[in-house]
From Swiss-Prot:
Subunit record text: Heterotetramer of two PDHA1 and two PDHB subunits. The heterotetramer interacts with DLAT, and is part of the multimeric pyruvate dehydrogenase complex that contains multiple copies of pyruvate dehydrogenase (E1), dihydrolipoamide acetyltransferase (DLAT, E2) and lipoamide dehydrogenase (DLD, E3). These subunits are bound to an inner core composed of about 48 DLAT and 12 PDHX molecules.
Listed EC numbers: 1.2.4.1
Binding-site list for thiamine diphosphate: Y118, R119, G165, V167, D196, G197, A198, N225, H292
Assigned keywords, A-Z: Acetylation, Carbohydrate metabolism, Glucose metabolism, Magnesium, Metal-binding, Mitochondrion, Oxidoreductase, Phosphoprotein, Pyruvate, Thiamine pyrophosphate, Transit peptide, Tricarboxylic acid cycle
SUPFAM superfamilies: Thiamin diphosphate-binding fold (THDP-binding) (SSF52518)
UniProt: pyruvate binding residues: H92, Y118, R119, A157, G165, V167, D196, G197, A198, N225, Y227
BP-aspect Gene Ontology terms: glucose metabolic process; pyruvate decarboxylation to acetyl-CoA; tricarboxylic acid cycle
Cellular component GO terms, alphabetical: catalytic complex; mitochondrial matrix; mitochondrion; pyruvate dehydrogenase complex
Name of the featured protein: Pyruvate dehydrogenase E1 component subunit alpha, somatic form, mitochondrial
Activity modulation notes: Pyruvate dehydrogenase activity is inhibited by phosphorylation of PDHA1; it is reactivated by dephosphorylation.
Length: 390
C-alpha cells in the first residue's frame, strides 16, 4: 500500500511541474481517425475520379498541421526579413497555398520527383530541407540549401529540381524527368508544377504532346491562384478550365484549399500514371495571400476585402484545424502547443540565417562541373581555378 501511494505521489508531483494544458492533453482520449466528406473533383476524359470521402488519422492530421503551420510561419518570417532588407532580390511567398505543397507531398512517395516554378519555399521544406537551410538560402549564407547562391527561386533537394526562374521553363524539364523514370524502368512519377500565368506558354503544350505520345508518368499540375502577377485569369485566358487544357490528356479540377482533397487527388493521379496510362493534368484552385512577389503590394488588382474573405472562409490551416477539433482528433490546446513550437523553430532559424557567414567570393565559380575538370578553367579572376562539389 505504501509503495502504491508513493508511486501515485510521484506521478502527481510530476504532473504539477507541467503546464495544465499538457496534463489535459496527455489525459484526454482522442479518436485514432475520422472520416470526412471532401469536394468532388471536376473531371475531363475520366469516367471516375478520386473518392469523395477520406479517412484522416490523428497522426497524419497532426503532421499535416505542423507542416502547414511551419510553411506559413516561415513565409511570414521571410516577409519580415525582406522588409528589413536582410533578404534581397526576387522573393515569392506561398502563404495561403499550404494545402497544395503539403497535400501533394502526402500523396506521393519520397522517391517520386517534383519540379516547380519560383514559388518554391514550401516544396523545398516538404522535400526534406530544414527551415534554417531555407531561410539561410534566402539571406545568401553558406548554410543555405544551395550554399547561399540560389536564393528564393533556385532551391533544390533530393528528388526536387527547383525552383526555376523562367516562366514555364520547368515543364519540359518535368516531362524529361518523367521520361527518365520510364526509361530506367522505375515505378516513379514526376509532379510538374506551373501557375495559371504560365499555363499559356507554348512550351507547356509541346510537353503535353510528347508526354502523351510516349505515355510518360508525368502529373502536370497547374496551381491556379487566380492571378498571373497582376492579371486575373479571366483577362489572360480564353478558357479558365485549365484542367482541360491537355485536351487529349485526362484532367482533374481540385479544391486546392483543402489538404485532404489535394492528397486524394494526388494519390489518384499517381496511381493513374504508375499504371502505364500516361500523363494526367491537375488544376489546383488556390489563393495566395501576398502579392506576386515582394515588389507587389497585391492590392492594386484585387481588394483587401477579397483577400480577407478567402482568409475567413477558406483558409487551409483553419479548415484542417476545425476538422480535427470537431472530430476529436486533437484539442485546441494541443494545436496551440504546436503553434508555439513552430514559432520557436522559425525564430531560431531566422537567427541562424542572419548570423551564418556569407560564402567567400571565390566560391562563385564552384559547383559548375560535376567533377573537377582535367584542365584549368579561368573565369573573371584568372588566378582562381573553378572547383566542382567541394
Amino acid at each position: 500500500m505504501r509503495k502504491m501511494l508513493a508511486a501515485v505521489s510521484r506521478v502527481l508531483a510530476g504532473a504539477a511541474q507541467k503546464p495544465a494544458s499538457r496534463v489535459l492533453v496527455a489525459s484526454r482520449n482522442f479518436a485514432n481517425d475520422a472520416t470526412f466528406e471532401i469536394k468532388k473533383c471536376d473531371l475531363h476524359r475520366l469516367e471516375e475520379g478520386p473518392p469523395v470521402t477520406t479517412v484522416l488519422t490523428r497522426e497524419d492530421g497532426l503532421k499535416y498541421y505542423r507542416m502547414m503551420q511551419t510553411v506559413r510561419r516561415m513565409e511570414l518570417k521571410a516577409d519580415q526579413l525582406y522588409k528589413q532588407k536582410i533578404i534581397r532580390g526576387f522573393c515569392h511567398l506561398c502563404d495561403g497555398q499550404e494545402a497544395c505543397c503539403v497535400g501533394l507531398e502526402a500523396g506521393i512517395n519520397p522517391t517520386d520527383h517534383l519540379i516547380t516554378a519560383y514559388r518554391a519555399h514550401g516544396f523545398t521544406f516538404n522535400r526534406g530541407h530544414a527551415v534554417r537551410a531555407i531561410l539561410a538560402e534566402l539571406t545568401g549564407r553558406r548554410g543555405g540549401c544551395a550554399k547561399g547562391k540560389g536564393g528564393s527561386m533556385h532551391m533544390y533537394a533530393k528528388n526536387f529540381y527547383g525552383g526555376n526562374g523562367i516562366v514555364g521553363a520547368q515543364v519540359p524539364l518535368g516531362a524529361g524527368i518523367a521520361l527518365a523514370c520510364k526509361y530506367n524502368g522505375k515505378d516513379e512519377v514526376c509532379l510538374t508544377l506551373y501557375g495559371d500565368g504560365a499555363a499559356n506558354q507554348g512550351q507547356i503544350f509541346e510537353a503535353y504532346n510528347m508526354a502523351a505520345l510516349w505515355k510518360l508518368p508525368c502529373i502536370f499540375i497547374c496551381e491556379n491562384n487566380r492571378y498571373g502577377m497582376g492579371t486575373s485569369v479571366e483577362r489572360a485566358a480564353a478558357s479558365t478550365d485549365y484542367y482541360k487544357r491537355g485536351d487529349f490528356i485526362p484532367g482533374l479540377r481540385v479544391d486546392g484549399m483543402d489538404i485532404l482533397c489535394v492528397r486524394e487527388a494526388t494519390k489518384f493521379a499517381a496511381a493513374y500514371c504508375r499504371s502505364g496510362k500516361g500523363p494526367i493534368l491537375m488544376e489546383l484552385q488556390t489563393y495566395r495571400y501576398h502579392g506576386h512577389s515582394m515588389s507587389d503590394p497585391g492590392v492594386s488588382y484585387r481588394t483587401r476585402e477579397e483577400i480577407q474573405e478567402v482568409r475567413s472562409k477558406s483558409d487551409p490551416i483553419m479548415l484542417l484545424k476545425d476538422r480535427m477539433v470537431n472530430s476529436n482528433l486533437a484539442s485546441v490546446e494541443e494545436l496551440k502547443e504546436i503553434d508555439v513550437e513552430v514559432r520557436k523553430e522559425i525564430e531560431d532559424a531566422a537567427q541562424f540565417a542572419t548570423a551564418d557567414p556569407e560564402p567567400p567570393l571565390e566560391e562563385l565559380g564552384y559547383h559548375i562541373y560535376s567533377s573537377d575538370p582535367p584542365f584549368e578553367v579561368r573565369g573573371a579572376n584568372q588566378w582562381i581555378k573553378f572547383k566542382s562539389v567541394s
